[in-house]
């Protein structure tokens, strides 16, 4: 039996102060339903970082997973680009 589809997002690390956890901000652009203006929306996810390899400013790929704690439902897949 095959696993269900898992969501994948790319975002920027905004905090790495916790142990084995990072906070990733994912930016999304949506059109306003009535006025048609494009709006930037940012959502923050708590992400499991097993080896504490991420730093603030890194661009990372994250994937949805089973609940790991009260707020963690995402895990780190790869670091797309390191911060300068």
From Swiss-Prot:
Gene3D superfamilies: Nucleic acid-binding proteins (2.40.50.140). GO terms for molecular function: rRNA binding; structural constituent of ribosome. One of its GO terms (cellular component) is cytosolic small ribosomal subunit. It comes from the Bacteria. GO terms for biological process: translation. Pfam families: Ribosomal_S17. InterPro entries: NA-bd_OB-fold (IPR012340), Ribosomal_uS17 (IPR000266), Ribosomal_uS17_bact/chlr (IPR019984), Ribosomal_uS17_CS (IPR019979). Keywords: Ribonucleoprotein, Ribosomal protein, RNA-binding, rRNA-binding. SUPFAM superfamilies: Nucleic acid-binding proteins (SSF50249). Belongs to the universal ribosomal protein uS17 family. HAMAP family: Ribosomal_uS17_B. Part of the 30S ribosomal subunit. One of the primary rRNA binding proteins, it binds specifically to the 5'-end of 16S ribosomal RNA. This is Small ribosomal subunit protein uS17. It comes from Thermoanaerobacter pseudethanolicus (strain ATCC 33223 / 39E).
């Amino acid at each position: 039996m095959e696993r269900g589809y898992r969501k994948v997002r790319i975002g920027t690390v905004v905090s790495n102060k916790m142990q084995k956890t990072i906070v990733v901000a994912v930016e999304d652009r949506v059109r306003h339903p009535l006025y048609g203006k494009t709006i930037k929306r940012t959502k923050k996810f708590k992400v499991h970082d097993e080896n504490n390899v991420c730093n603030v400013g890194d661009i990372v790929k994250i994937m949805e997973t089973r609940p790991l704690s009260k707020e963690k439902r995402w895990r780190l897949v790869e670091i797309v680009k390191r911060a300068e």
